[in-house]
Amino acid sequence: DQSQDLIDALHRGDLDILLLALPFPAESVETMTLFRDPFLLGAPPDHPLSQRKALKTSDLRGQDLLLLEDGHCLREHALEACKLRESEVVTPYQATSLSTVVQMVASGIGVTLLPEMAVKAGVVPAKEVAVTPFQGGDVSREIGLMWRRKTPRQTEFRLLGDFIVGHQTSM
């Protein structure tokens, strides 16, 4: 689901709490930042950028960058983290899911920006897509919790957030 759909469900009361990438504009909610999730470059193993130990965001200029379609916060967060404007990158194709983007990269169509947590979750086939970090560690997004401001469960949600923060290295 797109983030806006999840936030709408939160406002309707269909969901009590969300784990999502921040910031995301929403009214009448509280948020709690949990951790930073670095972006990594995903590229075909024979791509020139895959041969490097670490990259600069400027290395992305002129590359065929495969991203999710407009409306997905991952797209906006990835571009923002790399301090890139839409006009600075070539986006020949867009996809509706991260797994589709990864398959397009594996097919040699271009490169992409992958959240580290997705890579750790096994979204990327290791033999078909090479993953390279960026220098400096500041190419990342924030992951956090969001809940309705007037919920009677705020204390529980903050405790959940504290638990996640305290155990994130083991996740």
What residues fall within each predicted segment?
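Short beta-strand-centered segments that line the small-molecule binding cleft or hinge
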Residues: 2-39, 43, 80, 106-109, ...
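Short Pro/Gly-enriched coil loops immediately N-terminal to beta-strands
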Residues: 29-45, 53-61, 134-143
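A late-sequence structural motif
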Residues: 129-171
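Secondary-structure junction motif
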Residues: 64-85, 153-161, 168-171
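A local structural motif
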Residues: 83-92, 128
